[in-house]
């Protein structure tokens, strides 16, 4: 390449001398102009050629630099290994980016640490507040237990009290409605008795005159096949049939009212059962109750546990109640008598009139009696429950006295009707309502020994279980 440049230099020098000397045939002025034009063309060609050479040299320089960098990386890889390559060989701008990312990550870590510390402090405050609320609830439970004169080792559950209060309020409302219904029935029976007495005062009817209220036996006799077609088409028979239809219509209306009240009672009891199931589920989740016979069954009266570790659930009262009754027999008898009275009042006010049912001491009636004993849980007596019991006792007492007086008056005025009632037909008014269960009759007779002695034909004077007695019971 140096030789080529040298030869090129010699040729250019020769051409320059020829141009300077010029063509001797031309005049001096023209010779000078021709030399300048030739020099301009030559310089342009030379510049163009040099520009191409510069581009070629720059391209070769880039290739050589890339080869050099690759060679250096290969040498460093052979000396230091693969791990050190990524650490050592970074460009300047890449290192700056990495440093900036590291700084941002440090700032985020610091902010997260501050947030974590704030969350820990807030959690500590919440724990302290929770402990204060727990202490407050425990003090309130103790105060409530002291107010209600409960046992200090068995704190009363406030939720159970609220649930019981709601249930008793619903039952009280239902009892008021049933009392109004029974009052209307008593008024109707009074009117029937008055009509019967008026008809007897005017004179005896010819044969089978009806007075508006019939017994089941009279209805069966009137509608039997033997006598149904033989009724004469007289005004008396038409009046009897009208009275029969009216009595049956009134009975159907009463039964519809009873069914409606029974549905409302079932709804209230269903809500009560749902609340109790929810309470039991809560106790089961918390570990205070499990299915009987299971591995996790908890015995609240386990003597192996110390008194401080025993559960303070309200269910403990149901377990320890029998032992307390055995320890004090007098108090147990008094409490049993009060429970029987409240049970009788509850049955008298809540149970609908069992019209048309046979007076059989069935298991259903026994279960109702047992259910009445468990009607009041082993919680302190609430004022609403006492009001219900006192109201029921007053109503029962008034209805007993009134019915007894009316019954004696009717028997004095109509001795013939009492003799007829011994054979089976019903007196005016109430036999169509059917019989009461024997448990109700027994409780009623036990509460009225004096009235029973003065009226020995009490059970016979009112056939079909005594409709008046059903009225007295309610």
Swiss-Prot record:
Biased composition (Basic and acidic residues): 323-337
Organism this protein belongs to: Homo sapiens
Coiled coil: 1-199, 259-286, 385-414
Similarity section: Belongs to the CCDC149 family.
Protein name: Coiled-coil domain-containing protein 149
Spans annotated as Disordered: 301-388, 405-474
Pfam families for the chain: CC149 (PF09789)
Keyword Coiled coil: yes
Low complexity bias spans: 343-353
Keyword Membrane assigned: no
Sorted UniProt keywords: Coiled coil
Encoding gene per record: CCDC149
Domain of life: Eukaryota
């Amino acid at each position: 390449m140096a030789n080529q440049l040298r030869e090129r230099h010699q040729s250019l020098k020769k051409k320059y001398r020829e141009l300077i000397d010029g063509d001797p045939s031309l005049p001096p002025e023209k010779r000078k102009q021709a030399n300048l034009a030739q020099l301009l063309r030559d310089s342009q060609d030379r510049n163009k050629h040099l520009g191409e050479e510069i581009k070629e040299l720059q391209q070769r320089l880039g290739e050589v630099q890339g080869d050099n960098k690759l060679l250096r990386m290969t040498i460093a890889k052979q000396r230091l290994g693969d791990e050190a390559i990524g650490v050592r060989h970074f460009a300047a701008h890449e290192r700056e980016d990495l440093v900036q990312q590291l700084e941002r990550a440090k700032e985020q870590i610091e902010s997260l640490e501050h947030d974590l510390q704030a969350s820990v402090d807030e959690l500590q405050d919440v724990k302290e507040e929770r402990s204060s609320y727990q202490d407050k609830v425990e003090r309130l439970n103790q105060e409530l237990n002291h107010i209600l004169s409960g046992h200090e080792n068995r704190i009363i559950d406030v939720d159970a009290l609220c649930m019981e209060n709601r249930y008793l309020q619903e039952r009280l409302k239902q009892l008021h409605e049933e009392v109004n219904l029974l009052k209307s029935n008593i008024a109707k029976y009074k009117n029937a008795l008055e009509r019967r007495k008026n008809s007897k005062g005017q004179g005896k009817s010819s044969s089978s005159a009806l007075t508006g209220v019939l017994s089941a036996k009279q209805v069966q006799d009137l509608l039997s096949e033997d006598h149904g077609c033989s009724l004469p088409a007289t005004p008396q028979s038409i009046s009897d049939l009208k009275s029969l239809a009216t009595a049956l219509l009134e009975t159907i209306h009463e039964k519809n009212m009873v069914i409606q009240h029974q549905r409302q009672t079932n709804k209230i009891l269903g809500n009560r059962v749902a609340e109790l199931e929810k309470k039991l589920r809560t106790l089961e989740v918390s570990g205070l109750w499990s299915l009987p016979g299971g591995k996790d069954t908890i015995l609240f009266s386990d003597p192996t546990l110390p008194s401080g570790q025993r559960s303070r659930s309200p269910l403990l009262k149901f377990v320890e109640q029998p032992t307390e009754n055995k320890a004090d027999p007098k108090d147990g008898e008094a409490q049993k008598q009060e429970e029987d009275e409240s049970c009788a009042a509850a049955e008298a006010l809540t149970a609908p009139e069992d019209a048309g049912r046979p007076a059989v001491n069935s298991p259903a009636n026994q279960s109702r009696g047992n259910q009445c004993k468990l009607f009041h849980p082993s919680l302190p007596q609430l004022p609403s429950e006492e009001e219900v019991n006192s109201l029921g006792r007053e109503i029962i007492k008034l209805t007993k006295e009134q019915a007894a007086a009316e019954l004696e008056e009717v028997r004095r005025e109509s001795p013939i009707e009492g003799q007829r009632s011994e054979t089976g037909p019903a007196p005016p008014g109430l036999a169509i309502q059917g019989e009461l269960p024997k448990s109700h009759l027994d409780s009623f007779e036990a509460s009225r020994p004096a009235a029973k002695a003065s009226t020995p034909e009490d059970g016979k004077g009112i056939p079909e279980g005594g409709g008046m007695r059903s009225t007295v019971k309610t």
